[in-house]
C-alpha cells in the first residue's frame, strides 16, 4: 500500500508547519505553527511515533456540530488536527488514514519553493 508524506512548509508569517498527506494528496492532518524548522521536524517525529495508536486521537465538534479530531502526544499536547467532516464516520475514516500514513518517513520540504 502506498504511503503518504509530510509536507513541511512556511506559513504566511514565516513560521513553519506541516501537513500529513495521504497517497491521494489529500491533507489528513495539519500541525500547529512552529518558530523553527527543528521544532516542526520534532512535530513530524511525534506524529510518526503517536499517530499509529487510536488512543492518541480525540474527537471533537466545532460550533456548527461538524466533527473533527486532534492527535495528541503522550504528554497530552496537541500535535495536529483534521479538517471538519460531515459525519463522525467520515472523521473515523480520517483517523484510520492518519494511522495508516503516520509512519511514513517521506518529508517533502517546500520551504524553499
From Swiss-Prot:
Presence of the UniProt keyword Repeat in the record: yes
Pfam families: DUF1508
Alphabetical keyword list: Repeat
InterPro entries: DUF1508, UPF0339_domain, YegP-like_sf
Keyword field contains Transmembrane: no
PANTHER family for the chain: PTHR40606, UPF0339 PROTEIN YEGP (PTHR40606:SF1)
Family affiliation: Belongs to the UPF0339 family. Duplicated subfamily.
The protein's name: UPF0339 protein MS1092
Species in which this protein is naturally found: Mannheimia succiniciproducens (strain KCTC 0769BP / MBEL55E)
